[in-house]
Amino acid sequence: MYKVAVIKGDGIGPEVIDAAIRVVKSVTDKIKFYEFEGGLSVFKKYGVPIREEDLEEIRKMDAILFGATTTPFDVPRYKSLIITLRKELDLYANLRIIPNFKLRKEIIIVRENSEGLYSGEGAYDSNKVVDFRIITRKGAERIAKFAVKLAKDRSTFLTFVHKANILESDRFFRKIVLDIARKEDVKVREEIVDSFTIKLVKDPWNLGIILSENMFGDILSDLATIHAGSIGIVPSGNYGEDIALFEPIHGSAPDIAGKGIANPIGAILSAAMMLDYLGLDGSIIWKAVGRYVRRGNLTPDMEGRATTLEVTNGIISEIYRLDEYEIDEVWRDEVRLGRILLEIS
Protein backbone atom coordinates (compact mmCIF):
# COMPACT_ATOMS: atom_id res chain seq x y z
CA MET A 1 0.00 0.00 0.00
CA TYR A 2 1.43 3.38 -1.05
CA LYS A 3 1.07 6.43 1.18
CA VAL A 4 0.15 9.66 -0.59
CA ALA A 5 -0.05 13.05 1.11
CA VAL A 6 -2.92 15.21 -0.11
CA ILE A 7 -2.72 19.00 0.15
CA LYS A 8 -5.83 20.48 -1.41
CA GLY A 9 -4.81 24.09 -0.84
CA ASP A 10 -6.91 27.13 -1.67
CA GLY A 11 -9.60 28.17 -4.15
CA ILE A 12 -10.52 25.39 -6.57
CA GLY A 13 -7.79 23.14 -5.18
CA PRO A 14 -10.15 21.02 -3.03
CA GLU A 15 -12.61 20.57 -5.91
CA VAL A 16 -10.08 19.33 -8.47
CA ILE A 17 -8.17 17.15 -6.01
CA ASP A 18 -11.37 15.47 -4.83
CA ALA A 19 -12.05 14.69 -8.51
CA ALA A 20 -8.54 13.30 -9.02
CA ILE A 21 -8.80 11.06 -5.96
CA ARG A 22 -12.10 9.63 -7.23
CA VAL A 23 -10.47 8.79 -10.55
CA VAL A 24 -7.44 7.18 -8.89
CA LYS A 25 -9.71 5.04 -6.72
CA SER A 26 -11.50 3.86 -9.86
CA VAL A 27 -8.27 2.29 -11.20
CA THR A 28 -6.38 1.11 -8.11
CA ASP A 29 -6.89 0.20 -4.46
CA LYS A 30 -3.17 0.29 -3.66
CA ILE A 31 -3.03 3.88 -2.39
CA LYS A 32 -3.95 5.28 1.00
CA PHE A 33 -4.45 9.05 1.09
CA TYR A 34 -3.50 11.25 4.05
CA GLU A 35 -4.81 14.81 4.04
CA PHE A 36 -2.76 17.78 5.29
CA GLU A 37 -3.69 21.44 5.54
CA GLY A 38 -1.67 24.02 3.66
CA GLY A 39 -1.96 27.39 1.97
CA LEU A 40 -3.21 30.86 2.74
CA SER A 41 -5.92 29.64 5.11
CA VAL A 42 -3.30 27.85 7.20
CA PHE A 43 -1.07 30.93 7.20
CA LYS A 44 -3.92 33.01 8.57
CA LYS A 45 -4.34 30.55 11.46
CA TYR A 46 -0.73 29.62 12.25
CA GLY A 47 1.50 32.21 10.58
CA VAL A 48 3.09 29.64 8.23
CA PRO A 49 1.83 28.14 4.94
CA ILE A 50 2.28 24.64 6.35
CA ARG A 51 2.97 23.48 9.88
CA GLU A 52 6.37 21.95 10.63
CA GLU A 53 4.86 18.82 12.17
CA ASP A 54 2.83 18.25 9.01
CA LEU A 55 5.90 18.77 6.86
CA GLU A 56 7.76 16.11 8.84
CA GLU A 57 4.92 13.63 8.28
CA ILE A 58 4.82 14.46 4.57
CA ARG A 59 8.52 13.58 4.27
CA LYS A 60 7.57 10.00 5.19
CA MET A 61 5.09 9.67 2.33
CA ASP A 62 5.68 8.04 -1.06
CA ALA A 63 4.27 10.98 -3.04
CA ILE A 64 2.24 14.17 -2.74
CA LEU A 65 -0.90 15.19 -4.61
CA PHE A 66 -1.29 18.97 -4.52
CA GLY A 67 -4.19 21.20 -5.56
CA ALA A 68 -3.56 24.94 -5.83
CA THR A 69 -2.55 27.77 -3.60
CA THR A 70 -3.29 31.48 -3.42
CA THR A 71 -0.22 33.72 -3.16
CA PRO A 72 -1.48 37.28 -2.59
CA PHE A 73 0.60 40.40 -3.10
CA ASP A 74 -0.68 42.16 0.00
CA VAL A 75 -0.16 39.65 2.84
CA PRO A 76 3.06 40.50 4.72
CA ARG A 77 5.55 37.65 5.32
CA TYR A 78 3.48 35.11 3.37
CA LYS A 79 5.61 32.70 1.34
CA SER A 80 4.03 30.61 -1.40
CA LEU A 81 3.15 27.12 -0.19
CA ILE A 82 4.28 25.40 -3.38
CA ILE A 83 7.64 27.21 -3.38
CA THR A 84 8.03 26.32 0.30
CA LEU A 85 7.42 22.64 -0.48
CA ARG A 86 9.80 22.66 -3.43
CA LYS A 87 12.54 24.13 -1.26
CA GLU A 88 11.93 22.03 1.86
CA LEU A 89 11.70 18.75 -0.10
CA ASP A 90 14.35 19.72 -2.68
CA LEU A 91 12.03 19.09 -5.62
CA TYR A 92 14.53 20.23 -8.20
CA ALA A 93 12.93 19.06 -11.46
CA ASN A 94 9.57 20.26 -12.74
CA LEU A 95 8.15 18.28 -15.65
CA ARG A 96 5.17 19.80 -17.46
CA ILE A 97 3.30 17.90 -20.15
CA ILE A 98 1.10 20.01 -22.41
CA PRO A 99 -1.20 17.58 -24.26
CA ASN A 100 -3.32 18.15 -27.33
CA PHE A 101 -5.69 15.20 -27.26
CA LYS A 102 -7.34 15.99 -30.56
CA LEU A 103 -3.99 15.94 -32.39
CA ARG A 104 -2.60 13.21 -30.10
CA LYS A 105 0.57 15.23 -29.56
CA GLU A 106 2.28 16.83 -26.59
CA ILE A 107 4.86 19.43 -25.61
CA ILE A 108 7.25 18.40 -22.83
CA ILE A 109 9.03 21.04 -20.77
CA VAL A 110 11.63 20.37 -18.07
CA ARG A 111 12.06 23.34 -15.78
CA GLU A 112 14.80 23.74 -13.19
CA ASN A 113 12.75 24.06 -10.05
CA SER A 114 14.98 25.19 -7.19
CA GLU A 115 17.19 28.04 -8.40
CA GLY A 116 17.19 30.88 -10.92
CA LEU A 117 15.11 33.99 -10.36
CA TYR A 118 12.65 32.01 -8.25
CA SER A 119 15.32 31.10 -5.69
CA GLY A 120 13.67 33.43 -3.18
CA GLU A 121 16.99 35.06 -2.34
CA GLY A 122 17.80 38.73 -2.66
CA ALA A 123 18.25 42.00 -0.83
CA TYR A 124 16.35 45.23 -0.48
CA ASP A 125 16.24 48.58 1.23
CA SER A 126 14.00 51.61 0.83
CA ASN A 127 15.66 52.59 -2.46
CA LYS A 128 16.50 49.32 -4.20
CA VAL A 129 15.35 45.73 -4.48
CA VAL A 130 17.50 42.90 -5.87
CA ASP A 131 16.38 39.35 -6.69
CA PHE A 132 19.28 36.94 -7.14
CA ARG A 133 19.33 34.70 -10.23
CA ILE A 134 21.24 31.79 -8.77
CA ILE A 135 22.60 28.95 -10.92
CA THR A 136 24.87 26.49 -9.09
CA ARG A 137 26.94 23.69 -10.59
CA LYS A 138 25.01 21.11 -8.57
CA GLY A 139 21.66 22.52 -9.66
CA ALA A 140 22.62 22.79 -13.31
CA GLU A 141 24.17 19.32 -13.46
CA ARG A 142 21.26 17.46 -11.92
CA ILE A 143 18.58 19.13 -14.04
CA ALA A 144 20.71 18.64 -17.16
CA LYS A 145 21.09 14.92 -16.37
CA PHE A 146 17.36 14.67 -15.75
CA ALA A 147 16.43 16.28 -19.08
CA VAL A 148 19.15 14.55 -21.10
CA LYS A 149 18.12 11.12 -19.82
CA LEU A 150 14.50 11.86 -20.66
CA ALA A 151 15.48 12.89 -24.19
CA LYS A 152 17.69 9.82 -24.61
CA ASP A 153 15.02 7.41 -23.37
CA ARG A 154 12.52 8.91 -25.81
CA SER A 155 15.05 8.83 -28.68
CA THR A 156 14.73 12.54 -29.27
CA PHE A 157 16.81 15.69 -28.89
CA LEU A 158 17.06 18.39 -26.23
CA THR A 159 16.03 21.99 -26.87
CA PHE A 160 17.89 24.18 -24.39
CA VAL A 161 16.26 27.61 -24.05
CA HIS A 162 18.38 30.34 -22.49
CA LYS A 163 19.62 33.92 -22.62
CA ALA A 164 23.34 33.14 -22.62
CA ASN A 165 24.01 36.00 -25.02
CA ILE A 166 23.22 38.40 -22.17
CA LEU A 167 23.25 36.56 -18.82
CA GLU A 168 26.45 35.21 -17.27
CA SER A 169 24.39 32.75 -15.24
CA ASP A 170 23.01 31.23 -18.45
CA ARG A 171 26.50 31.00 -19.98
CA PHE A 172 27.47 28.89 -16.98
CA PHE A 173 24.27 26.82 -17.23
CA ARG A 174 24.76 26.36 -21.00
CA LYS A 175 28.27 24.94 -20.70
CA ILE A 176 27.13 22.34 -18.19
CA VAL A 177 24.12 21.29 -20.28
CA LEU A 178 26.19 20.95 -23.46
CA ASP A 179 28.91 18.94 -21.68
CA ILE A 180 26.44 16.46 -20.20
CA ALA A 181 24.50 16.08 -23.45
CA ARG A 182 27.72 15.48 -25.37
CA LYS A 183 28.77 12.71 -22.99
CA GLU A 184 25.38 11.00 -23.43
CA ASP A 185 25.39 11.52 -27.22
CA VAL A 186 22.17 13.54 -27.11
CA LYS A 187 21.72 16.25 -29.73
CA VAL A 188 21.07 19.76 -28.40
CA ARG A 189 19.30 22.57 -30.18
CA GLU A 190 19.91 25.96 -28.61
CA GLU A 191 17.27 28.68 -28.58
CA ILE A 192 17.30 32.25 -27.28
CA VAL A 193 14.22 32.60 -25.11
CA ASP A 194 12.85 35.71 -26.85
CA SER A 195 12.66 34.24 -30.35
CA PHE A 196 11.77 30.79 -29.04
CA THR A 197 8.40 32.07 -27.84
CA ILE A 198 7.43 32.58 -31.50
CA LYS A 199 8.44 29.01 -32.39
CA LEU A 200 6.52 27.69 -29.41
CA VAL A 201 3.38 29.42 -30.65
CA LYS A 202 3.74 28.72 -34.38
CA ASP A 203 5.38 25.28 -34.58
CA PRO A 204 5.32 23.51 -31.20
CA TRP A 205 5.35 19.84 -32.24
CA ASN A 206 8.99 19.32 -33.19
CA LEU A 207 10.86 20.63 -30.17
CA GLY A 208 12.04 17.43 -28.48
CA ILE A 209 12.46 17.85 -24.73
CA ILE A 210 12.55 21.53 -23.77
CA LEU A 211 14.86 22.50 -20.89
CA SER A 212 15.08 25.93 -19.28
CA GLU A 213 15.77 27.91 -16.12
CA ASN A 214 13.10 28.23 -13.44
CA MET A 215 11.34 31.46 -14.47
CA PHE A 216 11.80 30.93 -18.20
CA GLY A 217 10.36 27.42 -17.88
CA ASP A 218 7.39 28.71 -15.92
CA ILE A 219 6.53 31.33 -18.53
CA LEU A 220 7.14 29.06 -21.53
CA SER A 221 4.99 26.25 -20.17
CA ASP A 222 2.12 28.63 -19.44
CA LEU A 223 2.41 30.03 -22.97
CA ALA A 224 2.41 26.51 -24.43
CA THR A 225 -0.99 25.79 -22.89
CA ILE A 226 -2.62 27.60 -25.83
CA HIS A 227 -2.05 24.32 -27.70
CA ALA A 228 -3.86 22.32 -25.02
CA GLY A 229 -7.08 24.31 -25.15
CA SER A 230 -6.83 25.43 -21.54
CA ILE A 231 -4.28 25.72 -18.75
CA GLY A 232 -6.81 23.68 -16.76
CA ILE A 233 -5.85 20.38 -18.38
CA VAL A 234 -2.07 20.60 -17.96
CA PRO A 235 -0.44 18.31 -15.35
CA SER A 236 2.99 18.46 -13.81
CA GLY A 237 5.38 16.59 -11.56
CA ASN A 238 7.97 18.04 -9.18
CA TYR A 239 10.73 15.47 -8.64
CA GLY A 240 13.31 15.18 -5.90
CA GLU A 241 15.71 12.47 -4.83
CA ASP A 242 13.35 10.96 -2.26
CA ILE A 243 9.82 12.12 -3.08
CA ALA A 244 7.77 13.74 -5.83
CA LEU A 245 4.83 16.14 -5.82
CA PHE A 246 2.17 16.20 -8.52
CA GLU A 247 -0.04 19.20 -9.29
CA PRO A 248 -2.03 20.82 -12.06
CA ILE A 249 -0.22 23.94 -13.24
CA HIS A 250 -3.26 26.21 -12.94
CA GLY A 251 -3.76 28.57 -10.04
CA SER A 252 -6.35 28.64 -7.27
CA ALA A 253 -8.89 30.61 -9.38
CA PRO A 254 -10.78 32.09 -6.40
CA ASP A 255 -13.26 33.75 -8.78
CA ILE A 256 -14.79 30.36 -9.66
CA ALA A 257 -14.14 28.49 -6.40
CA GLY A 258 -17.26 26.77 -5.11
CA LYS A 259 -19.18 27.18 -8.37
CA GLY A 260 -18.62 23.60 -9.48
CA ILE A 261 -17.17 24.54 -12.87
CA ALA A 262 -13.42 24.11 -12.28
CA ASN A 263 -11.65 21.93 -14.84
CA PRO A 264 -10.46 18.78 -13.02
CA ILE A 265 -8.45 17.32 -15.92
CA GLY A 266 -5.09 18.86 -14.96
CA ALA A 267 -5.38 17.37 -11.47
CA ILE A 268 -6.56 14.02 -12.86
CA LEU A 269 -3.60 13.79 -15.26
CA SER A 270 -1.23 14.83 -12.46
CA ALA A 271 -2.58 11.87 -10.50
CA ALA A 272 -1.89 9.66 -13.54
CA MET A 273 1.74 10.86 -13.53
CA MET A 274 1.84 10.04 -9.83
CA LEU A 275 0.68 6.47 -10.48
CA ASP A 276 3.51 5.95 -12.95
CA TYR A 277 6.02 7.39 -10.48
CA LEU A 278 4.83 4.91 -7.86
CA GLY A 279 5.32 2.02 -10.27
CA LEU A 280 1.62 1.62 -10.94
CA ASP A 281 0.09 2.37 -14.36
CA GLY A 282 -1.48 5.71 -15.16
CA SER A 283 -1.96 4.91 -18.84
CA ILE A 284 -5.62 4.00 -18.55
CA ILE A 285 -6.33 7.47 -17.12
CA TRP A 286 -4.53 9.17 -20.03
CA LYS A 287 -6.49 7.05 -22.48
CA ALA A 288 -9.82 7.75 -20.78
CA VAL A 289 -9.16 11.49 -20.59
CA GLY A 290 -8.18 11.56 -24.26
CA ARG A 291 -11.39 9.84 -25.28
CA TYR A 292 -13.47 12.07 -23.07
CA VAL A 293 -11.90 15.31 -24.36
CA ARG A 294 -12.43 14.23 -27.96
CA ARG A 295 -16.10 13.53 -27.20
CA GLY A 296 -16.63 17.05 -25.84
CA ASN A 297 -18.86 18.12 -22.92
CA LEU A 298 -16.10 20.17 -21.32
CA THR A 299 -15.95 22.88 -18.65
CA PRO A 300 -16.38 26.61 -19.49
CA ASP A 301 -12.62 27.24 -19.78
CA MET A 302 -12.73 24.91 -22.80
CA GLU A 303 -15.85 26.57 -24.21
CA GLY A 304 -18.20 23.99 -22.75
CA ARG A 305 -20.97 23.95 -20.18
CA ALA A 306 -20.08 20.89 -18.13
CA THR A 307 -19.52 20.94 -14.38
CA THR A 308 -16.54 19.55 -12.50
CA LEU A 309 -18.69 16.62 -11.40
CA GLU A 310 -19.92 15.86 -14.92
CA VAL A 311 -16.38 15.81 -16.33
CA THR A 312 -15.15 13.59 -13.51
CA ASN A 313 -18.05 11.16 -13.90
CA GLY A 314 -17.50 11.13 -17.66
CA ILE A 315 -13.83 10.22 -17.32
CA ILE A 316 -14.61 7.46 -14.83
CA SER A 317 -17.23 6.12 -17.24
CA GLU A 318 -14.59 6.05 -19.99
CA ILE A 319 -12.26 4.14 -17.68
CA TYR A 320 -14.90 1.48 -17.09
CA ARG A 321 -15.37 1.14 -20.87
CA LEU A 322 -11.68 0.60 -21.56
CA ASP A 323 -9.81 -2.64 -21.76
CA GLU A 324 -6.81 -2.45 -19.41
CA TYR A 325 -4.36 -2.86 -22.30
CA GLU A 326 -6.10 -0.60 -24.81
CA ILE A 327 -3.52 2.17 -25.17
CA ASP A 328 -2.89 4.34 -28.24
CA GLU A 329 0.61 3.75 -29.61
CA VAL A 330 1.20 7.49 -29.82
CA TRP A 331 0.82 7.82 -26.04
CA ARG A 332 2.90 4.82 -24.97
CA ASP A 333 6.06 6.78 -24.12
CA GLU A 334 4.18 9.62 -22.50
CA VAL A 335 2.10 7.57 -20.10
CA ARG A 336 5.25 5.91 -18.78
CA LEU A 337 7.14 9.13 -18.11
CA GLY A 338 6.80 8.63 -14.39
CA ARG A 339 8.67 5.33 -14.50
CA ILE A 340 11.49 6.84 -16.52
CA LEU A 341 11.75 9.65 -14.01
CA LEU A 342 11.67 7.29 -11.07
CA GLU A 343 14.80 5.66 -12.51
CA ILE A 344 16.43 9.08 -12.83
CA SER A 345 15.76 10.00 -9.23
UniProtKB/Swiss-Prot annotation:
InterPro entries: ICDH/HICDH, IsoCit/isopropylmalate_DH_CS, IsoPropMal-DH-like_dom, LEU3_arc
GO MF term set: 3-isopropylmalate dehydrogenase activity; homoisocitrate dehydrogenase activity; isocitrate dehydrogenase (NAD+) activity; isocitrate-homoisocitrate dehydrogenase activity; magnesium ion binding; NAD binding; NADP binding
Amino acids binding Mg(2+): D194, D218, D222
Lineage per the UniProt record: Archaea, Methanobacteriati, Methanobacteriota, Thermococci, Thermococcales
Keywords, sorted A to Z: Magnesium, Manganese, Metal-binding, NAD, Oxidoreductase
UniProt organism field: Pyrococcus horikoshii (strain ATCC 700860 / DSM 12428 / JCM 9974 / NBRC 100139 / OT-3)
Family: Belongs to the isocitrate and isopropylmalate dehydrogenases family.
Cofactor(s) annotated in UniProt: Mn(2+); Mg(2+)
Protein role: Catalyzes the NAD(+)-dependent oxidative decarboxylation of homoisocitrate to 2-oxoadipate (alpha-ketoadipate), and of isocitrate to 2-oxoglutarate, at near equal efficiency. May thus play a dual role in glutamate and lysine biosynthesis in vivo. Preferentially uses NAD over NADP.
Name of this protein: Isocitrate/homoisocitrate dehydrogenase
Pfam families from the UniProt entry: Iso_dh
